[in-house]
Amino acid sequence: MVGVQICQGMTSEILFFSLQPQFSNMMNKNSRLHIDSNIRNTFFTEIGIGVSANSLLLLFNIFKFIHGQRSRLTDLPIGLLSLINLLMLLIMACIATDIFISCRRWDDIICKSLLYLYRTFRGLSLSTTCLLSVLQAIILSPRSSCLAKYKHKPPHHIFCAMLFLSVLYMFISSHLLLSIIATPNLTTNDFIHVSQSCSILPMSYLMQSMFSTLLAIRNVFLISLIVLSTWYMVALLCRHRKQTRHLQDTSLSRKASPEQRATRSILMLRSLFVLMSIFDSIVSCSRTMYLNDPTSYSIQLLVVHIYATVSPFVFMITEKHIVNYLKSMYVRVLNV
């Protein structure tokens, strides 16, 4: 799994930013994508669903904070993840208009801003998912565990961690501000095309090696934390199930605690994230083998944003107050 993530980071971490020379003719082949209305409509439908779901989840978290409800350790990261995914999808929607739809050409500032922010938000989405896994492991840890002392840490510690990650990703992605340019009106194969208006200058071998090394270190570190936290949570849940097996016939044992429901949501998200990462890596490798086939390219466009689209639904179905509110709204609509 770690190897797959490293491969993903090197080949499709920024979705379009491939460093192999054979991708220099990408837009010659992928320019046909704007003609296929099915691909375009499916992609924008996915983006629209993701934007709506993340907006709804973010609003619920804001209302919960305003009403002064007791917050859990994972509430702030969940709200931040919904905000990050929302901004990432909105930026991707802007970039997609330059991929699928012929419009006026962008200048250097627009290209640099959009692609740099998109790259940063994709990295933050990955790190926030990892942070959620670690925090859930802390919540489930028993009082005798060394992790128990972190249960009652104030939220500003989590905010500081996210701020540090933001600065780190902005630094790692800073080279894109120099290498991203508006595609010049020249017939040349030296540029790696990102969209109809934007291109990326080819990097030197040293820069490629440094960039790939940073991505590899990041992925190994984050995936290691995810694997360790997953193993820890599964071990705790198995031990808890054994201890309460004799209570299976009681109503208390049938009711999942909020911690258990939250843990299930994190485990579901992690499984989804890993599956999408593996599939994304397979599609990326197929793009390399078939010289950026437009079909593989369009599939990757859809796959790489599934996690950001589906994750808010997983969070919402595990929150009772959100489910009850949506049910009441549904009943009101039927009674109108």
UniProtKB/Swiss-Prot annotation:
TM regions (residue ranges): 43-63, 76-96, 121-140, 158-178, 214-234, 265-285, 297-317
Tissue expression per record: Expressed in 1-4% of neurons of the vomeronasal organ. Only one pheromone receptor gene may be expressed in a particular neuron. Not expressed in the main olfactory epithelium.
Residue intervals annotated with topology Extracellular: 1-42, 97-120, 179-213, 286-296
SUPFAM superfamilies: Family A G protein-coupled receptor-like
One GO cellular component term: plasma membrane
Major localisation: membrane
GO MF, one example: pheromone receptor activity
One of the GO biological process terms: response to pheromone
Record Pfam families: V1R
InterPro entries: GPCR_Rhodpsn_7TM, Vmron_rcpt_1
Sorted UniProt keywords: Cell membrane, Disulfide bond, G-protein coupled receptor, Glycoprotein, Membrane, Pheromone response, Receptor, Transducer, Transmembrane, Transmembrane helix
Membrane topology term: Multi-pass membrane protein
PROSITE patterns linked to this entry: G_PROTEIN_RECEP_F1_2
Protein location: Cell membrane
Role according to the record: Putative pheromone receptor implicated in the regulation of social as well as reproductive behavior.
Alphabetized PANTHER family for the sequence: VOMERONASAL TYPE-1 RECEPTOR
Similarity comment: family membership: Belongs to the G-protein coupled receptor 1 family.
Listed name of the protein: Vomeronasal type-1 receptor 102
Record organism: Rattus norvegicus (Rat)
